[in-house]
């Protein structure tokens, strides 16, 4: 409670949705190829992390890193970000050669996408009575975290202020205009009308 009293609010940007959450219906994820990738990745990280580390850093085969600059995961705007942002090193081969970086990412992945002991989709508003606000920002064309999952989270947790970037991908935080809107919404309580999705279509029958 002491920490909550000090918070102005919270902003989640392209937040990862865990396929293991009990409230997430199979009808929403059964055809999502990412679900299988996550399951396989968790198995590798748990049982043979050394093999995965070798594969991600080896030089024998090209494109060892499946995510780096891959249009399967990044839309056109994301690809432009990757081209013009020299410091962007998301899962890059050179960065992963540092074993400590790989180990930290491994722990993050296993905790974030492994089995949790609670269901976040049943949480109550931690900042009631206008004490603060919680925001969720999503890219309509996000190919890492599908927008349908973000919309479902919004439906289950209506106290979250949901913002959807029409042509945004997974790297919307690198868009200076969007980044400014995120900060203004959080710190000044300014609502960017262009990025507010007031209602959603029925996602799960």
How would you label these PLM feature ranges?
Residues 1-26:
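Conserved hydrolase catalytic core segment
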Residues 4-5, 125-131, 156-157:
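Short, conserved loop/helix-junction motifs that constitute active-site signature segments
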Residues 11, 135-137, 163:
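Hydrophobic/aromatic beta-strand patches that form the interior of the parallel beta-sheet core
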Residues 21, 26-123:
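Alpha/beta-hydrolase
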Residues 117-131, 147:
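The feature captures the conserved acid-bearing segment of alpha/beta-hydrolase catalytic domains
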Residues 128-131, 135-138, 142:
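Short beta-strand/loop motif that positions the catalytic acidic residue
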Residues 143-149:
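Conserved alpha/beta-hydrolase "acid-adjacent" motif
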Residues 151-205:
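Catalytic active-site module of serine/aspartate enzymes centered on a nucleophile-bearing elbow/loop
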